[in-house]
Design a protein with these regions (language model features):
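Low-complexity, Gly/Ser/Thr/Pro-rich intrinsically disordered linker/tail segments
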Residues: 177, 181-185
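Short, solvent-exposed loop/turn segments that connect beta-strands within catalytic domains
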Residues: 86, 138-142
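A surface-exposed partner-binding patch
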Residues: 1-128, 184-187
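Short polybasic amphipathic segments
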Residues: 142-149
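Compact, glycine/acidic-enriched structural inserts
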Residues: 154-176
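Short, surface-exposed beta-strand/loop micro-motifs that present aromatic residues
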Residues: 130-137
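Intrinsic disorder/low-complexity segments enriched in polar/charged and small flexible residues
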Residues: 47, 68, 106, 125, ...
């Protein structure tokens, strides 16, 4: 897919506390809290991260510990590991990486795929084929930022974490640059 990097969007303040990021997402999606687990799930992150060859951002892990996989507005699928199925997570990430490499990455963009340093690691997608990825740059996963590959070929960066990105996309704080509008209904998957 031919694309070009448009530019970056930067949040007014990057949320680094996972609980604060999740609270922002729950405010942006009032129906999300209806699907919150009654207790924080104990996921074996060592298995997940070893299979991926990298640690993952704490906001994503915190979201997965409190919520199962869900869809926003029947548009954006937020796939999350399930307790007891951590050994299967690598398959989903690898499948998304294969699609990214085969159909999306253009040499001119200068955006490599994971596991290359600073490589892209997909974490979500829309029903129209938009890809939401981490750019794995920085000393720790907490410094990673979101890269969006729009179905129309436009690529852009959001200088915050995945959970803050979802919150600001849903509450219209950020400009959706090529992403379609969707309602805020939350559906467990």
């Amino acid at each position: 897919m031919t694309g070009e990097l448009i530019e970056r969007q930067t949040p007014k303040r990057r949320i680094t506390d996972p609980a604060e990021a999740l609270a922002a997402l729950e405010r942006a999606l009032p129906g999300l809290a209806d699907h919150r687990r009654s207790a924080r799930a104990a996921l074996d992150w060592a298995v997940v991260e070893e299979s991926l060859g990298t640690a993952l951002p704490s906001d994503y892990k915190y979201l997965a510990e409190w919520y199962p996989t869900f869809a926003i507005g029947d548009c954006i699928l937020v796939s999350l590991p399930e307790p007891g199925e951590e050994h299967l997570v690598h398959r989903g990430f690898q499948s998304a990486l294969d699609v990214l490499v085969d159909a999306w990455l253009e040499p001119g963009l200068g955006l490599p795929s994971h596991p290359a340093p600073g490589g892209l690691l997909p974490w979500s997608e829309s029903d129209e084929g938009d890809k939401f990825m981490w750019t794995t740059a920085g000393e720790t996963p907490q410094e990673w930022f979101v890269t969006v590959a729009g179905r129309g070929g436009a690529w852009w960066h959001y200088e915050g974490g995945a959970v803050q990105f979802l919150a600001e996309l849903c509450d219209s704080t950020l400009e959706p640059w090529g992403l379609r509008l969707f309602d805020s209904e939350v559906t467990p998957c």
